[in-house]
Amino acid sequence: MKIRASVRKICENCRLIRRRRRIMVVCSNPKHKQRQG
């Protein structure tokens, strides 16, 4: 899980979702997991 100021899709499998007022990226590749902090 990477915590970044700006999250974006890295590949075509990445999905932007909102969870508990946070923008997150979930993907089939675990390296692409991100959270806005």
Curated annotation (Swiss-Prot):
GO terms for biological process: translation. One of its GO terms (cellular component) is ribosome. It comes from the Eukaryota. It is found in: Plastid, Chloroplast. GO terms for molecular function: structural constituent of ribosome. Keywords: Chloroplast, Plastid, Ribonucleoprotein, Ribosomal protein. Its main location: plastid. Belongs to the bacterial ribosomal protein bL36 family. This is Large ribosomal subunit protein bL36c.
